[in-house]
Design a protein with these regions (language model features):
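Charged docking surfaces used in two-component/phosphorelay signaling
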Residues: 19-27
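Short hydrophobic/Thr-rich beta-strand motif most characteristic of the beta2 strand and flanking loop
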Residues: 29-36, 44
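Active-site beta3 strand of CheY-like receiver
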Residues: 48-54
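Receiver (REC) domain active-site loop signature in two-component systems and cognate sites
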Residues: 59
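C-terminal output helix
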Residues: 110-119
Length: 125
């Protein structure tokens, strides 16, 4: 399968999670890049110019909440849609994701069809 679709940046400190999401994305025809924490995500977002970012909430160095806030404050990256991923499905986490600027919120574990549908909804494709 040719992967010429939009580039998705996967930000998660867990290698297995990044590879699993990458496999889901490849199956749907998306390209993907990865970052291991929020700090690296800031750099990769500026250099790779992804169409969308999947952001884990809990990571070392800089968590996803802070990374999303900074990405949305930066004129160079504020236009990039973000989907926040977290193991916590509580309403307060959904509200926090919206407050920091995430465009969508998914609770882990994320099913492949659920992830693909949410990406397509956010990207309007």
């Amino acid at each position: 399968m040719s992967h010429s679709g939009p580039l998705i940046l996967i930000v998660d400190d867990n290698l297995d999670a990044r590879e699993m999401y990458g496999m889901y994305l490849e199956h749907e025809g998306f390209r993907w890049a990865e970052a291991v924490n929020g700090h690296e995500a800031l750099t990769r977002a500026r250099t790779d110019r992804p169409a969308l970012i999947l952001m884990d909430a809990t990571m070392p160095r800089m968590d996803g909440w802070e990374a999303v806030r900074r990405l949305k404050e930066d004129p160079d990256t504020q236009h990039i849609p973000l989907i926040m991923l977290t193991a916590h499905a509580f309403q307060e986490h959904r509200e926090r994701a919206a407050h920091v600027g995430a465009d969508a919120f998914l609770a882990k574990p994320v099913l492949p069809d659920q992830l693909a549908a949410e990406i397509r909804r956010v990207l309007n494709i």
